[in-house]
């Protein structure tokens, strides 16, 4: 179930670069609400509160109830821009969510049971190939993350997108379900050890074969020691 947060916003009647700079000087961040077949609405938000929400993580997958001068607008952040030098927010785009709206989001991948995976116990390393999963869901069903159980993975094995169980009401938007999510990478020297172990029986076989004739050579010598049978009388 999606987490719904609240933010307070103020209508921004003036648009343009000059008006946006004036908002930032006043400690506010310009933003816009669009979508749901309605005209866009220009707004501004308190800078400090917005920074805290962005730094908290999962900002782009969090449904927000925007309180715009007393009127609630259910939205989801679709994009935000940061100052390239000082790293503070300079603009935010919010998508208006109509009733039953379905949207595409990218959510993080969380791993489960990595400590108990056989490959990890044997010295392997968990390699996360895909850090986020693209999904399609109703606004109220957006998961905060997708959980992947890797408790059965051994060295050299992988977990694919098709192996993941999705929450109810959530669909994948990936072109292929065989996308690799996680692999267990072997430790240093593992392949050499495997080759050496595989070569040991092969090397032992010729040695065993070489000993066989020596053992068989004792048989004639034993036969030579046997007394000759007495000749029959006529």
Curated annotation (Swiss-Prot):
It comes from Rhodopseudomonas palustris (strain BisA53). InterPro entries: Rbsml_bL25/Gln-tRNA_synth_N, Ribosomal_bL25/Gln-tRNA_synth, Ribosomal_bL25_b-dom, Ribosomal_bL25_C, Ribosomal_bL25_long, Ribosomal_L25_dom, Ribosomal_uL5_bac-type. GO terms for molecular function: 5S rRNA binding; structural constituent of ribosome. Belongs to the bacterial ribosomal protein bL25 family. CTC subfamily. Keywords: Ribonucleoprotein, Ribosomal protein, RNA-binding, rRNA-binding. It holds the Pfam family Ribosomal_L25p. This is Large ribosomal subunit protein bL25. NCBIfam families: bL25_bact_ctc, PRK05618.1-2. Part of the 50S ribosomal subunit; part of the 5S rRNA/L5/L18/L25 subcomplex. Contacts the 5S rRNA. Binds to the 5S rRNA independently of L5 and L18. This is one of the proteins that binds to the 5S RNA in the ribosome where it forms part of the central protuberance. SUPFAM superfamilies: Ribosomal protein L25-like. One of its GO terms (cellular component) is cytosolic large ribosomal subunit. It comes from the Bacteria. The gene is rplY. GO terms for biological process: translation.
């Amino acid at each position: 179930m999606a987490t719904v947060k609240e933010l307070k916003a103020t209508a921004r009647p003036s648009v343009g670069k000059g008006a946006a700079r004036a908002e930032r000087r006043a400690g506010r961040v310009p933003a816009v609400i669009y979508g749901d077949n309605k005209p866009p609405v220009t707004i501004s938000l308190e800078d400090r509160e917005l920074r805290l929400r962005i730094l908290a993580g999962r900002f782009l997958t969090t449904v927000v109830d925007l309180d715009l001068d007393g009127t609630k607008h259910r939205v989801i952040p679709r994009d935000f821009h940061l100052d390239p030098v000082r790293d503070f927010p300079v603009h935010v785009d919010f998508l208006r969510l109509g009733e039953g709206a379905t949207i595409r989001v990218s959510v993080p991948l969380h791993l489960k049971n990595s400590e108990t995976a056989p490959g990890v116990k044997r010295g392997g390393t968990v390699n996360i190939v895909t850090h986020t999963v693209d999904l399609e869901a109703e606004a109220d069903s957006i998961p905060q993350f997708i959980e992947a159980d890797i408790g059965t993975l051994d060295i050299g094995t992988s977990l694919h997108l098709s192996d993941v169980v999705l929450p109810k009401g959530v669909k994948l938007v990936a072109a292929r379900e065989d996308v690799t999510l996680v692999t267990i990478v072997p430790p240093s020297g593992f392949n050499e050890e495997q080759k050496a172990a595989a070569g040991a029986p092969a090397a032992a076989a010729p040695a065993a074969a070489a000993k066989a004739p020596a053992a068989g050579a004792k048989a004639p010598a034993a036969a030579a020691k046997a007394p000759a049978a007495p000749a029959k009388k006529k």
